[in-house]
Swiss-Prot record:
Record bears the keyword RNA-binding: no
Protein's name according to its UniProt entry: UPF0758 protein Mbur_0382
Motif mapping: JAMM motif: 177-190
Binding site for Zn(2+): H177, H179, D190
Ranges where the MPN domain occurs: 106-228
Disulfide bonds: none
UniProtKB keywords: Hydrolase, Metal-binding, Metalloprotease, Protease, Zinc
Database matches in InterPro entries: MPN, RadC_JAB, UPF0758, UPF0758_CS, UPF0758_N
Keyword Membrane set for record: no
Pfam families in UniProt: RadC, UPF0758_N
CDD domains, alphabetized: MPN_DUF2466
Record GO terms (molecular function): metal ion binding; metallopeptidase activity
GO biological processes: proteolysis
Amino acid sequence: MCGYQVRIHDMPSEDRPRERLLKHGPGFLSNAELLSVILRTGSKDENVVSMSSRILSEYNLKQLSQANISQLTKIRGIGPAKASQIAALFELARKLEIFTDDPKRKIRSANDVYSLLYPRHRELKKEHLTALYLDTKNNIIKEEVISIGSLNANIVHPREVFKSALMESSASVILTHNHPSGDPAPSREDIAVTEKLVEGGKILGISVLDHVIIGDGRYVSLKEEGYIS
């Protein structure tokens, strides 16, 4: 049993995180209070502030941001609903970073792609084909998951990749997907999909700069391997 058992509704209004946020703004709240606003409710043994404080004493924000749903639900007091709220929070934060004027969002090499996506891809149980849409200076203007599941040239259609490229006036595209096995070596289907999309890009005047396959702590660039000229 936790020592701090006062229910949120029994706390003075000026001490409740949501009311404090509304009155003073989010910058006035501690990390535990901000997390409690996201989680909304605690358990029968802990109010949400106490629960949030405990979680952040056991896991830092970086660890929480990198945890998948399965890992989050192993935390005491966190079920599927709360795990989904936490995962959605950090995914929004990651998407926001794409639109900031951050030099890390300029793609200069395949290693930049790997550094950006590996923290999210390393725990995925299925292949996720992701497109990074770039402007003329190779800054990311949009990131989009195109398909989930094993790549197949008959399933992945160029229009799914280039629809957003045209809508965003993207100058070029970088493809990336993960190999849950941990081995980033390209399969014949990986190469076939890449060749199909490169040809589709040529027709539309949108360059496919690379296809980066992410494995366990390593990656393969199909550009560097000579599959994309």
